[in-house]
Amino acid sequence: MLDVPVLLAAVSPDSPCGDDLEYDAAFLELERIAQGQPERQMGDAVLPAEPPEWPRVRALASELFGRSKDLRVANLLLQSNVALDGLDGLADGLLLVRELLGQYWDGVYPLLDADDDNDPTFRINALTGLVAEPLLQLVWAIPLVRSRAFGPVNLRAALNAAGLQRFASETLSPEQIAGAFADADADALAATRRALDGAQEHALAIESGVAERVGSAQGLDLGPLRQLLRQALQVFDLYGPQGAGESLAPGAEAVADEQVGAAPVAAVAAPAPRASGEIANREDVLRQLDRLLEYYVRHEPSSPVPVLLKRAKTLVTADFAEIVRNLIPDGISQFETLRGPESE
């Protein structure tokens, strides 16, 4: 597990972010070992590709944090953490990136381009590693639930079984994923849910924090990662302890308990999802706004609508007075007059 406070400690009082390690031998070695070994031919034999030695990647990346606060190093540290610690590792790694940006925006590497009006392109490019294929492939493989009957069920298999995405190679059925959740340890499920919530919160905070500093036009789109996290939470809503308790037919939980470890899991009723598009709470509102933002980023990037949508997100949890103050600053005094004195 990452010790985030230790990793965030300033390199020195005079130089909190240390040196730029872009051409440093240790950083180049980190990039090399993080790639693993590609498939290669030796004589007549074809040697299969080998994944990176993730413990070694994490150790070297953590060591480099003592010399530099660098988002490129943080990305490789995040990858190793996901590979080794799953969803907990993802949440911790995203928290590290979030705090790097929050505490060290002026000095974290890559630096803003001082010769081009503090252009953030290099920094944004480094942050896009959060939605690049190497990390997303690791997230797909994260065990979402561990069942005594089925073993670990990764995110890819769970999303396919829940009907949220389709993969021809995945065969787990809705009944089986329901059985896996019914068979899983309740404390482990609760910990997984907390990690998902934390990862989603940190991803949203990273996006909004960057947008506040550089503007939405030059901001960061973590849509692909947020979509996976949102869909993982949907699986929990459908099959997890709370969702399953509401959706299973009467007596189905008892049937599931009796069949722990048994093969015929089909007797467990598959949870019925909510009607598509139904909005039941503010969290659903925020998720729908995220979906709208993803559409505009992908299909109408020049549209001004995302600016309004992002502003709307900040108002979802505000009270009426806060909304008036945000939208019509000069109108708050009129609102106070209309409202009259508060009753004692």
From Swiss-Prot:
GO terms for cellular component: type VI protein secretion system complex. Core component of the H1 type VI (H1-T6SS) secretion system that plays a role in the release of toxins targeting both eukaryotic and prokaryotic species. Forms a dodecameric ring-shaped structure located at one end of the T6SS sheath. May properly attach the pre-assembled sheath onto the baseplate and/or stabilize the sheaths tubular structure. Homododecamer. Interacts with TssB1 and TssC1. Interacts with TssK1 and TssF1. Disruption phenotype: Deletion abolishes the secretion of Hcp1, Tse3 and VgrG proteins, all markers of T6SS activity. This is Type VI secretion system component TssA1. It comes from the Bacteria.
